[in-house]
Amino acid sequence: MRIERRHTTTGQSPYAGIDFRLTTSEIRNPDGSVVFKLDNVEVPTEWSQVASDVLAQKYFRKAGVAARLKKVEEESVPSFLWRSVPDTEALSQLPEKERYVSELSAKQVFDRLAGCWTYWGWKGGYFTNDEDAQAFYDELRYMLAMQMVAPNSPQWFNTGLHWAYGIDGPGQGHYYVDPFTGKLTKSKSAYEHPQPHACFIQGVGDDLVNEGGIMDLWVREARLFKYGSGTGSNFSRLRGEGEKLSGGGRSSGLMSFLKIGDRAAGAIKSGGTTRRAAKMVVVDVDHPDIETYIDWKVKEEQKVAALVTGSKINQKHLKAVLKACVNCEGSGDDCFDPEKNPALRREIKLARRSLVPDNYIKRVIQFAKQGYKDIQFDVYDTDWDSEAYLTVSGQNSNNSVSLKDDFLRAVETDGDWNLNARTSKKVTKTLKARDLWEKIGYAAWASADPGLHFNTTMNDWHTCKASGDIRASNPCSEYMFLDDTACNLASANLLTFYNVATKHFDVEGYEHLCRLWTVVLEISVMMAQFPSKAIAELSYEFRTLGLGYANIGGLLMTMGLPYDSKEGRALCGALTAVMTGITYKTSAEIAAELGTFPGYKKNAAHMLRVIRNHRRAAHGQSNGYEALSVNPVPLDLVSCPQADLVSHAQAAWDAALELGEKHGYRNAQTTVIAPTGTIGLVMDCDTTGIEPDFALVKFKKLAGGGYFKIINRAVPAALRALGYRESEIAEIEAYAVGHGSLSNAPGINASTLKAKGFTDEAIAKVEKALPTAFDIKFAFNKWTFGEDFIRDQLGIGAEAIAAPGFDLLQAVGFTKREIEAANVHICGAMTVEGAPHLKAEHYPVFDCANPCGKIGKRYLSVESHIRMMAAAQPFISGAISKTINMPNDATVEDCKSAYMLSWKLALKANALYRDGSKLSQPLNSQLIADDEDEDDAVESLYEKPMAARTAQVSEKIVEKLVERIIVMREREKMPDRRKGYTQKAVVGGHKVYLRTGEYDDGRLGEIFIDMHKEGAALRSFINNFAIAVSLGLQYGVPLDEYVDAFTFTRFEPAGPVQGNDSIKYATSILDYVFRELAVSYMSRFDLAHVDPTESNFDALGKGVEEGKEPDEGHHASKLVSRGLTRSRTDNLVVMRGGSTAVAQGNDSAPSGGSKVTALASHGASARVGDVLEGAVALKQEVSHDLSPTEKLEALQWSKSGTAQTLVPSKAERRAEAKAKGYEGEMCSECGNFTLVRNGTCMKCDTCGSTTGCS
């Protein structure tokens, strides 16, 4: 083949006109800990910090790269393509630590990728001469550096490591078909033939243990997950529940095996340690177990709700039952007899009313009877990574139902539908098609699964129908082909071809890229190895490719075209038609030189029919299609905003058909539209795949850490395209992003602040904090100005300042309306709705997938997403990965209508995601106001007898008094001589010393942390962190707040723990420290790996009648560290005048003494004798429930105006993420709440991780 140079010059480096810079790549956890850091990284100057971080963190090879290399001469290969190996002689001259290094330059990565492709292309005979090979090598490197295109992640991981660095290792059970002999060969090297494929479809037969069967599939899936790829399978061949087995007996059914596969996938994070397994499960709609399958995730979500709610109800009532026993003033066993203990009787009735099992109630009473004062009952939450979700099944795959047209027509006519046995083919059940359709609609509405595969349409466009039907897809549903095949992907960045100045899309440049990258992907098939024999053979036989694009949403906005418009859809259709037409034309050209794919001859008639149908759509024909059940949406020739795109598209398809009829095709498929998650970040795409944008204001990462707000770069370009003046554009931008200053702010500005008592110095402080503030309240708080200033200068009392949810601006007299107006001016509206100068008819140009900002109301409709997909689908070999976002108030009928429209517009697949359909996702608004909870409390109070009402009201009065005491308290100084304990341990190979200091009553008041032989910086940070925690404890911050914030944080050092009797593994130093403190001071044995007390109600006991011993524990607690004894004093002996008594630390009061209700703090009971002592015990129980707005104020500002994060809770971080336009879920790799929906998957904007395979 001849290769044209379009971007490079013969004899010049492809990087000659590209500036490069050095940067530091760093990714941090939300708590500030470093996940990854690499210095002196060389990247193109125009690359963003996020693109640089993703390249450095994910795609740089960090091990085994020899510092000295030498070329291996090959006679038949041009010298510039000779591969390299380590130069052992030169390496021996270097210090041992310097011999093997990491890749540090983007040029190294571009060179190894393009060099490897060109090397194999040369050996495969793809180039006419040396000059063509050199041009191919140079053009590819230029395109990669300019972010014009990117291959899928496995190419970045694996391709060129053997060619560029001589990295090698023994085979891992992979296979390839030798391109020169055509023979299936087992790989002897793990690297010589790279594994560049991201997407796999695997078959599974109705066989338990043999090759190709059920258990074999889990092994094959594990091999793919390990290397970072995704896989999908159709399980419809598996027998339904109750079907006969060949050896006698009955089948356990489809679902039993799907649950095994789900557990296996959940145990393996895709890529070994990087992300969850990417997996697709498909079941045909006529399978006997289809109803159970459709309801699978719905019922599992219900189980999560039951676990969460039930655990809270059980804990509440069981603790109340135990408390009624412990606080009883009766004698002997009377306290444990509900007939003699009215309080116990009442609590048992309440527990039964809440359906707490009688057996458990009885168990707790027996537990109390043995002398125990508290019970540990785990409470679950709806967090995606919580124990509740880990307990249920069905959470590790995308589930789809495969529908044929006869089912959908039965839905339209209200016909019957038969479910058929797998073996006998007999009808096992007949039901109404609409009833099953209703189940599908409800399940999608309630749990976001199943998605749908429109199987008839998929197979109508199938190029190789003679070789079998398409039955499944990869996890993201863009690759659809025969079982046991694979596809390697690459995506073009459409925006790089658009010239903003000339308002013209470079069609020729786009065609040039499509041609070259068809060759790249074809060469990748030739050089690849595969995880099984079948996949190796069929991938060689059909040679499927997956070229696609990204940034269509960014391109449309830049051009000033609404995503939901005829022009936008026509442009999308034309660009897609050009791409696939050129790829098939190129495939035919390769076939003329190297021959067709081996399966072509058998399928020539089917393939040419499909190509003719593609061509008809490109020529705008509405009918005349061959053998299609549903006609596609043809190219809109009139509405396309750039006429030459239409003519190029039609010419490409004319040539593709003409050359194909003459030479055949090298590839059975050539294009898909993938979600482009991680690779979209490497290309700095505003939008991924075919998606619109998700927000107009983005948070751009800085090289030194932190973020700053910027307008989406497409917005000013769109405004210029729409004819706005630069001054108007500047004002619209400032409206969206904010002015970052008090200057000219309405309501709140320098003059109004001075009138309220603010000094010039205070105003200067807040001005410094405002440019990076997400909300004005983040800057106007006590951490910016200091409590002394607010109290002394502004005259606000200490009690008000310390109150939860304290709002300084409201406290000094500003109204909510004034605050909101100032907030929009200073911090930005995060939307252009309501912006000055912007005409209402231009609003649709800036519509996103979700409403933007706090005041944004507009977002793209469900139908607009589906119609955009329909505009592209007729020109795609495979399908489109996309999830349709639906608002929270969407109905089941809306879901069914969306699916029905998708079928009628000839889509091959679709999936829906209704906002709030997962329990783990936070709602955008509160269901009912807090005061309605108070109404419920009043109603329940009136239901009780007068004595109980009096007791409850009195308790509330005490509670308020206690709370007031707590709120008003100043710093509680530690005693000069204090007790505590020192714990030495080794965490992940690093020595850690934890020392505690306690108040006289045993409460924790300070901690010291030291790390043995660590660097000065880390030791200093850890020491100062301990001081900060100690100050918080002394000012009344409950220990459980720290425990909740810092347990389960992840950063190095981490790993096994030695030297601690309770903690055996920690995910970080902070995780270890706060687990230890929680176990020792809060009796949080759920955070321990070994229970130090074994004080469960089924334990053997201590050998004494614990409930009848004298109360001596409160004396002993003043003499011994509560932490050292793990909050237990039952093993202490108090000597008094020669007599011995067993001290029961938390026992009941002696008979005859006054009894005050004990106020327990997180499992550590405390006998309280008066209100003040009650306040001390109760302070850790005070729950500062914040509103969503208050939760956002977790960001605190230091006196310098710099943001200081006190690690807000997950709920707080979710709320902020939702406000910024993210999904509100946490990235499982870096812990940041920056996930955006990406096709059927999710993508992290911080670290680049995806839940899919690109």
Swiss-Prot record:
Highest taxon in the source lineage: Bacteria
Top EC group: oxidoreductase
Leader sequence residues: none
Keyword Nucleotide-binding: yes
Gene3D superfamilies from the UniProt entry: 3.20.70.20
Pfam family, one: Ribonuc_red_2_N
Catalytic residues (UniProt): N474 (proton acceptor), C476 (cysteine radical intermediate), E478 (proton acceptor)
Cofactor note: 5'-deoxyadenosylcobalamine (coenzyme B12).
Disulfides per UniProt: C199-C487
Cofactor field: adenosylcob(III)alamin
Biological-process GO terms, alphabetical: DNA biosynthetic process
Enzyme Commission designation: 1.17.4.1
Catalyzed reactions per annotation: a 2'-deoxyribonucleoside 5'-diphosphate + [thioredoxin]-disulfide + H2O = a ribonucleoside 5'-diphosphate + [thioredoxin]-dithiol
GO molecular function terms attached to this record: cobalamin binding; cobalt ion binding; nucleotide binding; ribonucleoside-diphosphate reductase activity, thioredoxin disulfide as acceptor
Record's keyword terms, sorted: Cobalamin, Cobalt, Disulfide bond, DNA synthesis, Nucleotide-binding, Oxidoreductase
Protein family according to the UniProt entry: Belongs to the ribonucleoside diphosphate reductase class-2 family.
Known role: Catalyzes the reduction of ribonucleotides to deoxyribonucleotides. May function to provide a pool of deoxyribonucleotide precursors for DNA repair during oxygen limitation and/or for immediate growth after restoration of oxygen.
PANTHER family in UniProt: RIBONUCLEOSIDE-DIPHOSPHATE REDUCTASE, VITAMIN B12-DEPENDENT RIBONUCLEOTIDE REDUCTASE
Protein name: Vitamin B12-dependent ribonucleotide reductase
Organism: Bradyrhizobium diazoefficiens (strain JCM 10833 / BCRC 13528 / IAM 13628 / NBRC 14792 / USDA 110)
Gene for this chain: nrdJ
